[in-house]
Amino acid sequence: MSRNAQNGTGERQLRRLETFLDVAYAVLFVQFIMYLPETEDMAWAELPYGLLSLLIENSGELLRLVIAVGLTLFSWNLTNKLLAPLQRTDATHTFLMLLHLILVCLFLFFAISDPMLVTLSSPVGQSLCLAASGFVGIGAWYYARRQGFTRTSLSDADKNQVARTAVIEPLTALTNTGFAFVGPIAWTAGWLVIPVVLIAGRRQWERRTGRSR
């Protein structure tokens, strides 16, 4: 097969991969909706404020659900961040990105199986799955870069910036694994605090080393 034909095949395969991943993430978001408080029995009608009271009674579970949706959204954003600079893909890169998606689906399993974090396995499993999926995605990016799959318009500085920004998500998840052993509140707060600390630290390091943001 000629070089041009291979490039054309790689470009089409990348488009199909992007479409498949977007559809898969859409399905994941639909799954989260299914775990909203049940309203079919109309028991909420007897509550003082109706549906609002139902949401208040389930506020703890809803908070965890919102966090799970947010983390899935971050994973989707990470996926786009790692695919947007690419011009084409191949079988190995596609496999790595599908493995990245499988790990996100495994995160969903831990998130919806124990939304109240009754057992330690749920927060630890969620954190490790997101960390692993992020690092696999970054590994796929480095592979694609070495193979020359990136857009020709990108400079080396642009390519380095992709990895520097993408690493925040998996580092947050990996660091927050330790907070899972402290307790559910610490683990929940970790998702909000750790990224801020990491981003601030990265910017300070970039200023000291003279790197552009």
Each predicted region: which residue ranges?
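Multi-pass alpha-helical transmembrane bundle typical of ion/small-solute transporters
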Residues: S2-R213
